[in-house]
Amino acid sequence: MANFKGHALPGSFFLIVGLWWSVKYPLKYFHHKGLKNNRLSRQQERIEIIEGAVKTLFAIIGILAEQFVPDGPHLHLYHENQWVKLMNWQHSTMYLFFGVSGLMDMITYLYFHIVPLGLDRVVLAMAVFIEGFLFYFHVHNRPPLDQHIHSLLLFGLFGAAVSISLEVILRDNIVLELFRTSLLILQGTWFWQIGFVLFPPFGRPEWDQKDMDNIMFITMCFCWHYLVALCIVAINYSLVYCFLTRVKRRAEGEIIGIQKLKSDHTYQSALLSGSDEE
């Protein structure tokens, strides 16, 4: 959808998943830290399956929104010797590949004894690459600011595709996972930024899309967005660490208390048995 909602919708999807990853991966990392066996528990596998289902649901919602809005193509690709709403079709194609990625996530953890390890990462990398590929040819013959604000997103997309591809070999690498998370959060916030710049809501004045100062500001703004994404990842990582440390200390305190009660009970029993003998 070539409007504000058409950019806010995917931006919200990517932002939700990115925020979830910024909590999930630190939890997973600290849980497995120090353990010899990195195999996922049943509960963790269930979470991965649910995440795949949610990704697939987001993709279906996105496709339906692109196709069946009032001015959408309604599944018509070619009509009366001309293409029908190709921009909506490009967005639908992007959602389609992320839906396939969600399905592969579910298949990977439902049939882990059959599916080769790393195939879920391959499909996710492919989905991100396809998104970047579509965006590269999405803005030809557009005003300079429109082209520039979309092209900036390509750096994050292709960077994420390379990072996810490395995860096929270096699976469960916390650095790569957090890097991918930061780029996904960046992608989510930047979709919102594109919507505000190209389709200003609430009756705000439109941006001059040929003004070089606007292009310079948007470039700087992209860097700020990524800094915010990194801060979000760092803050959530720290919060997860503090939370788990507190839970661990409380659990250790309870264990020490139980052991102390047991030792006191044993000592009292010994005293009683000694007095009985006397």
UniProtKB/Swiss-Prot annotation:
Entries under InterPro entries matching the protein: DUF716, TMEM45
UniProt membrane topology term: Multi-pass membrane protein
Pfam families membership: DUF716 (PF04819)
Keywords, sorted A to Z: Endosome, Golgi apparatus, Immunity, Innate immunity, Lysosome, Membrane, Phosphoprotein, Transmembrane, Transmembrane helix
Entry GO terms, CC: endosome membrane; Golgi apparatus; lysosomal membrane
Phosphoserine: residues bearing it: S273, S275
Transmembrane segments: 7-27, 49-69, 95-115, 117-137, 149-169, 183-203, 215-235
Location, primary (coarse class): membrane
Keyword Transmembrane: yes
Record-linked PANTHER family: EPIDIDYMAL MEMBRANE PROTEIN E9-RELATED, TRANSMEMBRANE PROTEIN 45B
Function per UniProt: Plays a role in innate immunity.
Annotated family: Belongs to the TMEM45 family.
Name of protein: Transmembrane protein 45B
Taxonomic source organism: Mus musculus
Lineage: Eukaryota, Metazoa, Chordata, Craniata, Vertebrata
